[in-house]
Every structure is written in C-alpha cells, then in structure tokens.
Amino acid sequence: MQEHSPIVLLGGTFDPIHFGHLRTALELQQHFGESAEVRLIPCGDPRHRSAPKASGEHRLAMLRLALEGEPSLRIDEVEVRRTGASYTVDTLLELRQEVGNLRPLIFVMGTDAFESLPKWRRWLEIIQLAHIMVVNRPGWSFCEQGELGDFLRQHSAESNNDLIRQPAGKVGFITLTQMGISSSKVRELIGLRLSPRFLLPDSVWRYIRQHRLYGAVNA
C-alpha cells in the first residue's frame, strides 16, 4: 500500500448488505485504482435516521460474508464499536488520527445526503478532514443557491484527480451503476415470505435465515 494512496469511505446501515452496496464499493475502488482502499463503515446509532433493524454484530457478520474473496474491500468497525450517538465528523476525526494528515480520505455520499449536508453536525469541519465524493443519480441537478452553493463553489474539484493529490478539501461527483436495490426492499420481501435471492449474496441470505433476521424463517 502506498503511503499516500486514498482511502474511500462508504458508510451505511447495510441492513442488510446487498449487491447495490457491493457494486458501488467495487466501482469506487476501480475508479481510484488498485492502490485505493475502500472501507465500508456500518453505522452505529445514526442521528438522522431510524435505528437499524439488525444489531451491529449481525450487520458486521453479514458484511464479512459478503466481502469474502474481495481483498480490495474492507470493513471499518469504528462506528459500530462507538457507544452513544454516531456523527460523521467524529468518525473522520478518529480516522485522521489513525492514518495521519497526509493520506487522502474520500467520504462518499448520495445526492440527498449532500443536499442535507448543512444540517449535519459540524458540517464545515467535514471538508477539512476529508474530500466529499457525491454519487450522482439520474436526472439530479444541484441548485447552486444558498450556503451549500457557496460551499460547492469554494471546494469543487476540477477533476476527481484532485481528490488524490491532497488529503482533504474538495468535492467531486461520480456516476456509478444504478442497480435499483435497497435494504428496505430486501426486508420487505423477507417480511412477505418472498425470496430476496439475486438481490444479495447467497451467504448473506443463509445467515439471515439462520438467525431469523427481519422475520425470516429458517427453512
């Protein structure tokens, strides 16, 4: 691993992990090159959404099963192991202490999350600790008004190469494969006693049945 190779941070509830998450992680790794490290960070106690249905231990176990055989992707337990409320700025502060001040950190978020960024705790500190990579969705256009518009004009990257030339401070955009899979849809199917196969790895589906998560029956 090169000293200043980027670390790409993909957070989420992963409740459960599915092929949409995995494809996103793989495409991010391929985009930034073989030296890039992609970390999937399952959330702990998120303040901006309802608590996950499965425990942190179960979600970690499903992630481990899903990532078997893919060494370019790894799990970071920083938020799951934290007690109390979990905020992105605290996660980035911990990661900065771990990797130092020179290595690029690239925090990935969707368009909805980016538009709500000014509501996040100590949001202006986030860009001091990491870059932000926004995953475009089809038909999305950004309204460049208000404080977020000013923020983007100040920090917008000319190209995504800017995100690997310095440790933090830039906002980039990327278009990835849209798979139309959601964890809530997987849970809905399970609750209806319908199979979610081909939406998530078979190993994860077996684990869900084994532990009767989301109302699954171990058949």
UniProtKB/Swiss-Prot annotation:
CDD domains: NMNAT. It comes from the Bacteria. Its EC number is 2.7.7.18. GO terms for molecular function: ATP binding; nicotinate-nucleotide adenylyltransferase activity. GO terms for biological process: NAD biosynthetic process. Keywords: ATP-binding, NAD, Nucleotide-binding, Nucleotidyltransferase, Pyridine nucleotide biosynthesis, Transferase. Coiled coil: none annotated. This is Probable nicotinate-nucleotide adenylyltransferase. It comes from Hahella chejuensis (strain KCTC 2396).
